[in-house]
Amino acid sequence: MAWVIDCSLALAWGLPDEQSPKADDFFSLDHSQQEILVPSLWWFELANGLTMGRKRKRITEDQFLRLLGAYDALPIQTDSHSGFNFVQALQRVASQFELSGYDAAYLELALRKGAGLATLDKHLASMALRAGVFSVFPS
């Protein structure tokens, strides 16, 4: 099965003060035979979360470097959809499911790829279920 992961899950796995057993469980699974999909937005959110974590001394430089290695080891595939037609698609998903444009990027990708959605965001998870997308978190 393919999975779309959002940054709430990824950062909860990486930042010590945001640790989540659900994130730990998800990332402890063997994903070698699965696709992990992210919209290009994910990289900006990850960079911002880690940068702010370092700036606010939530993680050390060594932890930052270890996290980069851990994320790099995941079989992440970045979706490259962009352009005005994509903006329209995101707007439709955002409007239909009462999401921000950012959260719509994750749900739109899961819908388009027939993937599950792994998120710790309760609203995004509930809208994914409403859209017929399997969402593992939260329950």
Regions found by a protein language model. Give the residues of each.
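Acidic, PIN/NYN-like endoribonuclease modules and their adjacent C-terminal/linker elements
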Residues: 1-2, 79, 107-139
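Short, well-structured N-terminal submotif of metal-dependent ribonuclease cores
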Residues: 1-41, 53-65, 131
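Long, hydrophilic "mature protein body" segments
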Residues: 5, 26-31, 73-74, 92-96, ...
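Alpha-helix capping/helix-boundary segments
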Residues: 9, 42, 85-86, 106, ...
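Phosphate- and divalent-cation-binding pockets in alpha/beta enzyme and binding domains
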Residues: 22, 45, 89, 126-127
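Active-site-proximal, substrate-binding regions of enzyme catalytic domains
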Residues: 47-77, 87-89
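Active-site neighborhoods of divalent-metal-dependent phosphate/nucleic-acid chemistry enzymes
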Residues: 76-116, 120
